[in-house]
Amino acid sequence: MEVANCASLPHTVLVPRDTSAPAASAPAVTPMAFARAIVVAYERHAKSPATALQLAQIAPTQLRDPNARMTAAQMETLAAAAMQELDDEGLAAYGRKLPWGSYGMLARASLSAPDLGLALKRWCRHHALLTDDVRLTLSASGPQATVSVQEQADLGDLRELTLAFLLRNVHGLACWYIDSRIPLLEAGLPFPAPPHADAYAHMFPGSLRFGTRMATLQFDAAYLALPLRRGEKDLRLMLQRALPIPVRPYRRDRLLVQQVRQALGNHPQECHNAEGVANLLHVSTRTLHRQLKDEGASLQGLKDEVRLERARDLLYRSTKPMKQVAAAVGFQSEKSFNRAFRQWTGTTPAKFRSGDG
């Protein structure tokens, strides 16, 4: 299934899209209203959209049909052509142009953040340098994180496209930063449900509300603590992509790995086996193993990582006898601890402590 893309462009915008089916055979679910909004952008720049529409294979009759739909690939082609031709990634929605490369600059500015929370805060703050017509904020209340878009100017005929684009862009960027799918708890849109409201279920899977006070995205706040998994090389490669980053690389939800690590580190006595870990996380052991496998991890592998980190810390920072270190790390005997430590590191605990390892 292909997802309706509200504003897709190469080099700068990250819009999750399932590419399991080729564009030619994918269903057309993206509303033609988005294409009509891009035509309005051309009109505001006093330019013709003919070339962009031709590249996207959108006929004038389709453009005039209020019920017409297009594929995500058509929308990507149209938006990319328009943003480059107009040199405006804001598509004329704001009081000033957003030159080609603006959103790539924002992505780079947040790349050095230690975790997703700080990266998104920077991204929202830096967005105000591009335009003050909208204000983006990230907030967290209890277990829920919210990205909000406050309109500070009349976006006119481009309002729906602009708000949908902003939400999709920040969600796609967040997924890309941590290399993980981020399920949405709810998306809020501050306008009545349009005739093509069904398309929004593809754009924002999860609970969806129209007529909210402002545009919002809500997701589990635990994702904010996840570290960024991208570097400058990744960014350069991403900026060379001709299509938005698809959702497939993010089908593995890395949040569970983080939760398992925390459980193993904070509750070692309760996490001797899979049943104990599963009980702490309120999932079945079958679900635990299956989801960890989907994320490319295993419970034993995570236990070894946590044990090794704990062992290194105790060996380096304390003078506890080796038997006590072994017990603190979760081994019943010093011998089994020595054997495991050698397998992990290639050296013995004693040599590691002395600095000879």
Describe each model-derived feature in a short phrase:
Residues 71, 163-166, 304:
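Short, conserved glycine- and acidic-residue-centered signature motifs
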Residues 194-195, 199-357:
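Extended mid-to-C-terminal alpha-helical interaction segments
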Residues 1-147:
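N-terminal low-complexity or simple alpha-helical regulatory segments
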Residues 135, 139-226:
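DNA-contacting interfaces and partner/effector-binding or oligomerization modules
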